[in-house]
Amino acid sequence: MANYFNTLSLRQQLDQIGRCRFMQRSEFSEGCDFLKGKKIVIVGCGAQGLNQGLNMRDSGLDVAYALRQAAIDEKRDSFQRASGNGFTVGTYKELIPSADLVYNLTPDKQHSSVVEAIMPLMKEGASLGYSHGFNIVEEGQQIRSDITVVMCAPKCPGTEVREEYKRGFGVPTLIAVHPENDPQQQGWDIAKALASATGGDRAGVLESSFVAEVKSDLMGEQTILCGMQQAAAVLGYEKMVADGIDPAYAGALIQFGLEAITEALKIGGVTNMMDRLSNPAKIKAFDLSEQLKDMLKPLFGKHQDDIISGEFSRTMMEDWANGDANLLKWREETGQTGFENAPEYNGKIDEQEFFDNGVFIVAMIKAGVELAFDVMVEAGILPESAYYESLHETPLISNTIARKRLYEMNVVISDTAEYGNYLFANAAIPLLADKLMPSIGTELIGKPFAAASNSVDNKTLVAVNKAIREHGVESVGDTLRGYMTDMKAIVEAV
């Protein structure tokens, strides 16, 4: 199979990568009614499979799970998750032939084999759903012409899809219809119903394309969402311990600090996050973030270029064929880092303390969000898509780190995201360790920022505030956050 994106003309590529329209609430007035009474079979019961299925069932849809015979016979985790939550579970042959919609929520690396196995079993005129377009765009999967192919892509790990739904909210979601497979012209009705059933319409839905989703999703998860947070955690912890900070406190400051800091980001963007700092600390964090952007822009650019060209996908699929040799090696190395093995902290850290003692973390988040947004927009991805991939999903990933550190993050994200995360972090960590960290002291990570005076130059502060508030990610973010009127604070203190 050939990379689908690379078979398109330049004009078609630009058209597909630039597809993005923020949908109005009124477009979801019928909720998920289009799928009610239809038989939906989810293939796979991992993080996305289980949690989307739970939301869909709670929204009134008929959901069952199709698993491989071996998974059922051996009562593997996927079988235990589905059956333990009261779902009907059967084999492909038992469930697929009667399904109106088959929702493929298996890991990316399994998509080709799964689709080849289920497609002959699907009835005439059925629909096939994805939550990530890698199989269609990067692998070039060919789908039977009578089958409608849609996407419903929540912009966060599966666990957060469920948690936000239970809070009465949802997560921003991209929907798309594969232009080669919409024979009955019902693709958008199906995709909209899926977004409503999983809770996405409560947080904002973008009408997108398979291409735009893949190219922006890969960039976001590799850089700010996972790679920058892993780099910040590893570097920040090592620096604090080297400078005499209690290892238990250092671990907690990062583990829970990322969540607290990015919660401010979620509620009010970079502006709100930076406003949580004192004026002297804000100016320092701004200057540090600009320094970080200068250092990291070539790396961000390389990742985006490799994603657009297909080079990233090619090398990752080579690793798949090699038994995930690099992925497993990098996973083991991450598990051996100081941060992952930090002792538990028994004290209490006030929520404001995460900001006061974590100026370095704030600067890393600001730099990562703005760089990822800028580089995506430069590549032709529209600002709305770039915002969701660079800013809104960041706190949702931070929430996973707060649970069980980097291990939890890398467990709940996809293997594709995990591979890209390591690829980025493994380049960013030594770069920053050499060029930046020698200049970082405990006043920037570990202890309160202590300026010689709380006084600041008014013109400097005005210029800093102007630069923060007029950045593109803040302009589009202010509009999109206006849709999220039901957001609930989830962080207080530890």
UniProtKB/Swiss-Prot annotation:
It comes from the Bacteria. SUPFAM superfamilies: 6-phosphogluconate dehydrogenase C-terminal domain-like (SSF48179), NAD(P)-binding Rossmann-fold domains (SSF51735). Pathway: Amino-acid biosynthesis; L-isoleucine biosynthesis; L-isoleucine from 2-oxobutanoate: step 2/4; Amino-acid biosynthesis; L-valine biosynthesis; L-valine from pyruvate: step 2/4. NADP(+) binds at residues 45-48, 68, 76, 78, 108-110, 158. It catalyses: (2R)-2,3-dihydroxy-3-methylbutanoate + NADP(+) = (2S)-2-acetolactate + NADPH + H(+); (2R,3R)-2,3-dihydroxy-3-methylpentanoate + NADP(+) = (S)-2-ethyl-2-hydroxy-3-oxobutanoate + NADPH + H(+). The active site is at 132. GO terms for cellular component: cytosol. Involved in the biosynthesis of branched-chain amino acids (BCAA). Catalyzes an alkyl-migration followed by a ketol-acid reduction of (S)-2-acetolactate (S2AL) to yield (R)-2,3-dihydroxy-isovalerate. In the isomerase reaction, S2AL is rearranged via a Mg-dependent methyl migration to produce 3-hydroxy-3-methyl-2-ketobutyrate (HMKB). In the reductase reaction, this 2-ketoacid undergoes a metal-dependent reduction by NADPH to yield (R)-2,3-dihydroxy-isovalerate. This is Ketol-acid reductoisomerase (NADP(+)). It comes from Pseudoalteromonas atlantica (strain T6c / ATCC BAA-1087).
